[in-house]
Regions:
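A sensor for short, sequence-defined functional sites
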Residues: 1-340
Length: 340
């Protein structure tokens, strides 16, 4: 209760270990002053619900408090237990905020992501195909950092335990009609691991019949399915708003298929793709790139996909869409296996 006067007493807060959204700011600021650490209070709002307009100021925009440490360009979110001294929460990125220093001087500035490489998904996938090509065994190691780690740890934190049916399905390859999970191991899932951006690690093993099919006597391997379902963008209507993603992020896949001896691949060149978005300053700010090679019955595929900007120009929507859809197109890729 923000009207409870006891919660404005610093001694009471430390003794009872109880505070509210406002008094916890008092705790932090007094500790920073004692330690002679420079700080500012930043007040903003969720960008998905309200755009903070610094030119047409409205007090209703002052909805969420952050503590900004200017010397290190990091934020503390005192009312969100999943955040530590790190980047600002993703739903505040790109919004403006009112920054207030200890002398009560203020200014307006955009909340910026300091580390563009903060959020990554790394997947190592090993697929073993038996001689009869029926049941594929897939071993996968995943690592999530940044906002991906924070988001997925929240799912675990809000679940009954770290091994619910929902989590096991969520953290294994999506889009497989036939999937049996043989092993599921999750590490670093406590929210304390968000400190220093330590990766959330998930190791799984599953079997599926969904990767190989026969079509007109040909053996078809659904290579793309191992990356899981991907987003699509369509342009049926004229775009009105600028393009804004959840947060800058990166994906890396290291995929290996162990093919039974005696088989060759007819169309490996189909697995090489590249789509990119080049900003006006000449930098590549979004890209999907895949490459593949086949040697000694091992098909190796490497994929990198990244989005380094939070916002993209709406008049270049088609270029942005091509990058997004490249991953969806890869998911649908099939190659033909034929005997030597």
């Amino acid at each position: 209760d923000k009207n409870d006067q006891k919660l404005n007493n610093i001694d009471y807060i430390f003794k009872q270990k109880e505070s509210n959204d406002f008094s916890i700011i008092q705790v932090y600021t007094q500790l920073f002053e004692l330690a002679e650490i420079e700080y500012e209070i930043a007040i903003s709002c969720n960008r998905f619900y309200l755009k903070f307009d610094p030119d047409l100021f409205d007090p209703n925009q002052l909805r969420e408090f952050l503590i900004y440490l200017p010397k290190s360009n990091i934020y503390i979110s005192p009312n969100r237990i999943e955040y530590r001294a790190t980047e600002a929460p993703d739903d505040l990125l790109g919004n403006y905020a009112m920054y207030i220093d200890k002398n009560l001087d203020y200014y307006f500035s955009e909340i910026i992501l300091e580390n563009k490489n903060f959020s990554k998904i790394n997947k190592e996938i090993l697929v073993n195909l038996p001689k009869n090509l029926k049941k594929a065994v897939i071993n996968e190691n995943r690592k999530f950092t940044g906002y991906w780690g924070i988001l997925n740890r929240n799912y675990v934190y809000l679940s009954e335990n770290e091994k619910t049916d929902f989590l096991i399905d969520y953290f294994t390859i999506s889009g497989l009609d036939d999937k049996k999970v043989l092993k599921y191991q999750i590490n670093n899932y406590d929210i304390d691991y968000n400190f220093r951006n330590q990766p959330l690690r998930i190791n799984t093993k599953l079997i599926t019949r969904d990767l190989v099919k026969k079509v007109d006597g040909k053996t078809i391997l659904n290579v793309g399915k191992v990356i899981g379902l991907q987003s699509n963008l369509f342009n049926e209507d004229e775009r009105i708003n600028p393009i804004e993603i959840n947060f800058p992020n990166e994906y890396y896949y290291d995929i290996k298929f162990m093919i039974p001896k005696g088989y060759k691949i007819a169309n490996i060149h189909d697995l090489t793709k590249e789509k990119k978005f080049i900003s006006v300053d000449g930098n590549v700010t979004a890209q999907f790139k895949s490459s593949a090679n086949f040697e000694k019955n091992r098909l190796s595929i490497k994929i990198s996909e990244f989005y380094n900007s939070l916002k993209y120009e709406k008049n270049r929507y088609d270029e942005f869409r091509d990058v997004i859809n490249a991953a969806a197109e890869f998911y649908n890729l099939e190659i033909e296996l034929s005997k030597n």
